[in-house]
Every structure is written in structure tokens, then in C-alpha cells.
């Protein structure tokens, strides 16, 4: 049966992003911060919300939070745009610089929303495959840039789902072309490597970041973009006017004012990542060296079966399928969560 004419034929094959919602005891599938949000900070957030905050629209540019971020990053407030998660800002980049007749380039495997938003905005999309060890092939990337002449290039660094990292010198080489290079630093706190200082020299660089990972605000949806003033102006033209709610804005301010709390958690997660990597390798598995808060692990042809076995025991990890059908992506949990995961894997294997 044909659908009415107001449905888009092009969207018939488009699949929505659907997380696997099943019951669990240990959740290691979405790269979230495994620690409980500090109660003292939650109380501080509530204490800063007034009775007039809810009936009034929020600041459309999240002015106070914008200033706090600018002070932390050493840029102007005018270099920053806040978003309802960095996912929204990816869409805004496509709305401002992509669209019909425009071209975007990214890498494979990488974050699925680059491709998704390209499709939604009718932006032609191409990918360069990572090498077998998931490192970036600069020669192939240059060939693709010269062939397709993209307007937008998306680079997740560290990359999701592999956890691998591209060095700053390589990023400089990618900035030598006439395109907007978007470096998605969602996991930067776990790698310690950022391209943000390059903004002083390169007007065609965009840095994407989020409060969802290291800063434990995934449930509030808060991200930000740092770029030249001219690029920021274009993003503001296309974003929704009141895109970040007042609760998220205040939470962001409180989190930034209490960075030491999260720095301690970051150190623990990084230490656990290294321990988990070594323990997975000792089980005879092939983990990929990670610079994020997760580890991609090769399980061979049994990956999907093992994924289901873990679900049956209340442990969620991410099965990726496709070209990564032999892999599972495992978020670094608390020491106890990781211990239980390793124990169960030892029994399954």
C-alpha cells in the first residue's frame, strides 16, 4: 500500500536511532559516566533555580554558561554556541553548511549521526575507511578530499566506536584544505589531546564537545561548539532559539564551577580503562587500545552470541554489527562493574 503523497519517499529506508532498551543490572553500552551524580551538586543546582525560571523562556544563547566556558577555554563568548547535546549542533552544522548540492566527508567506522544528519539534510556523504588497525590513512583521506571537494569534514577524536586518536599534526594537514573541519572531542577528557588551540590560527576549524560523558550530564542533553565568530553566527541563524532549557544551563554552570569533582572521576575511569584492557587481553581477547571511556573488543564470530549471553545476565554492552560484527564496545564502568563483567566473560568464554 502506497503512503500518502506528503510522506517523503527518500525517508522510507531511513532507520531511526534506537538504543536497545532492555532490563539490566550493569549498563556498559552508551559510554556514560558510571558514577552517581554528586548529591551536593544536585542540591546546588536546585538552589539556583528560582520560581520565575520555569514560566519564562531560557536565555537563547545561554549567556552565563557561555561566559564560564569562554573563561575556561581561553576564547571569546562569541566563539561558543550551546546546544541540546552535541547531536543538535551536528545537525545545525549541516543546516548551515550542508544541504542539497553540498558534500560532507567522514570516516568509517565512526559516529553514526554524521551520516544520519547528512541524509536528513540531503547532504551528499562520503566516507574514508580507517586502516585495519583503525588508524587514519592520511594519503587516502587526501585523495578523497581532492576527489569529492567536501564542504564539511567530520573527525571524531578520539573516535567512537574505536577509541583511537589522530595526532595534532595530522589535523593540521586536514585543515590545509578549503573545507570546514569539525573535530568532535566528545571524549577529550579521557585522552588529554585537543585541537582547540588551533582555533587561533585556523578559521575553518570547529570543535565539538559535550557534558554527557566526563561531566555526567547525559540525561540533561548539553553540548557546545567552539569556532570562529563567523561560523558561530551561521550556526545561530539555524539553531532553535530556546534550545537549551534553564535547568541544563544552570547545571552546566555548577558542573564547571566544580571541575575538581569530575577530574577525580576521570582519573579513576582512565585507570580502570587500562586495567580492563589488560584483563580483557588476558582472557585471550583482542581489545583495541583506547583513548576514550570505552574499549572496542574483537570477539570473533561469537560476538553477537556473547552480547546476548551478557544481556541474559543483566550486563549491557554495545553490539555494533555491520563491518564491526565481530566486535563489542564496552564502556568502562566502576571497578565493581568491571569485575563482574570480567567474571561473566570468563565463564562464557
Swiss-Prot record:
Lineage: superkingdom: Bacteria
GO BP: L-histidine biosynthetic process
Enzyme category, top tier: transferase
HAMAP family per UniProt: HisC_aminotrans_2
Assigned protein family: Belongs to the class-II pyridoxal-phosphate-dependent aminotransferase family. Histidinol-phosphate aminotransferase subfamily.
Keywords assigned by UniProt, alphabetized: Amino-acid biosynthesis, Aminotransferase, Histidine biosynthesis, Pyridoxal phosphate, Transferase
Catalytic activity entry: L-histidinol phosphate + 2-oxoglutarate = 3-(imidazol-4-yl)-2-oxopropyl phosphate + L-glutamate
Subunit relationships: Homodimer.
Cofactor: pyridoxal 5'-phosphate
Modified residues (N6-(pyridoxal phosphate)lysine): 213
Pathway linked to the protein: Amino-acid biosynthesis; L-histidine biosynthesis; L-histidine from 5-phospho-alpha-D-ribose 1-diphosphate: step 7/9
Catalytic activity, EC: 2.6.1.9
PANTHER family: HISTIDINOL-PHOSPHATE AMINOTRANSFERASE, HISTIDINOL-PHOSPHATE AMINOTRANSFERASE-RELATED
GO molecular function per UniProt: histidinol-phosphate transaminase activity; pyridoxal phosphate binding
Keyword Amino-acid biosynthesis tagged: yes
InterPro entries: Aminotrans_II_pyridoxalP_BS, Aminotransferase_I/II_large, HisP_aminotrans, PyrdxlP-dep_Trfase, PyrdxlP-dep_Trfase_major, PyrdxlP-dep_Trfase_small
Name of protein: Histidinol-phosphate aminotransferase 1
